[in-house]
Amino acid sequence: MANFDLTRINCQFLDRHLTFPLLEFLCGKEIYNQQELLEYILETVNKTNMIDYTMDTRKRLNLSQEMPEELVQRKAEVLATLKQLQNEVAPIMKATDILKNGESMKDSKTFVNALQKDYNFKVEHLESAYLAKYLYECGNYQESTSYLYFCLIVMSPNDKNYLNVLWGKLAAEILTLNWNTALEDLTRLRDYIDNANFSTIQALQQRTWLIHWSVLVFFNHPKGRDLIIEMFLYKPLYLNAIQTMCPHIMRYLATAVVINRTRRNALKDLIKVIQQESYTYRDPITEFLECLYVNFDFEGARLKLHECQTVILNDFFIVACLNEFVEDARLMIFETFCRIHQCITISMLADKLNMKPNEAECWIVNLIRNARLNAKIDSKLGHVVMGTQPLSPYQQLVEKIDSLSMRSEHLAGLIERKSKQKQNQESADSWKYY
């Protein structure tokens, strides 16, 4: 299934350290040559300060069991530099500990003023940012987050390093699996990017990177399944970035919609986008939805669902969703089939769901028992009779709000572009006589 593996593409938009979990995940699969994969990991880790990880990778490649002199010397240099940086920031960190329990920590401006007044602190000489970066390169992500948090408190959003700190903080929180904090940092970074004075190309690049990083957060946070749909499908700027720069992200958006039963209203909009982008990107997951909701090809959907399982099993981002995806995909096939045939035989249904008749009957009974399906089973005839299942007022309201929100953002974007064009034209006109 190397044809459907997105690791190579995804790694292009991730920080070097964020690629290591993906690469290690692939080592447990049989998609690529293990020797070549380990050699690539070694090449990548050599660009960091993670000497122990480098040595471990060398052992896995059977290069040597003892650390080469070059690595011994490099490790000593890394530790010396780390100690020097820690000594440089020690006075400020000590002052921060003293001020933590006081009133000044309640407000960042007051906190910075207290540091400047009592400890002669200058934001321009912020060594903590360099220490945080160095700790991060050493793989000490937890300690790095503490210094990055301090930087965000004392830095102005106009600081030249502020954006780098935002990216670093998000990466470190992801790598320490702090999903709640990572989501907060993701939201803060997105707001900064959306409101920054970037050129069109710069904004597109920043959003493309953020989209890839956010997938790691969304599929690990309890609220992520709703948030990924809202951001990728209903925020025009991000949907445009996906369509322009990374249509392969459709896999993750489609997966989120399939496993999110409360957002079935998003299916119609998702299918439109899948059809629009089908000439640039297709995989078994998007093709499954096309078979089911565009072509009503139930046999094709059944075959694609089998392929989807292999794709998900080998995708680091969504492997944890495998069982849920299969369950919800079967339910989607069932619901769609029942819209066309109000009364169906269990044997026919079992064939469409790739299940044995007794398994299919038990599966339907559980759906009815858990109040997820309005239907009745006639055991004598072996029939399933569907009842009507109207859309709840809440879902209707959510659908209308999403639609209005998307249209509002689209109009706001048009107005902003026209305003910029007008300003540029006025600026050009004012210079035409010179």
Swiss-Prot record:
Keywords: Cytoplasm, Initiation factor, Protein biosynthesis. It comes from the Eukaryota. PROSITE patterns: PCI. Pfam families: eIF3_N, PCI. One of its GO terms (molecular function) is translation initiation factor activity. Residues 218-391 form the PCI domain. Transmembrane segments: none annotated. One of its GO terms (biological process) is formation of cytoplasmic translation initiation complex. It is found in: Cytoplasm. InterPro entries: eIF3e, eIF3e_N, PCI_dom, WH_DNA-bd_sf. Belongs to the eIF-3 subunit E family. Component of the eukaryotic translation initiation factor 3 (eIF-3) complex. The eIF-3 complex interacts with pix. Interacts with mxt. This is Eukaryotic translation initiation factor 3 subunit E. It comes from Drosophila sechellia (Fruit fly). The gene is eIF3-S6.
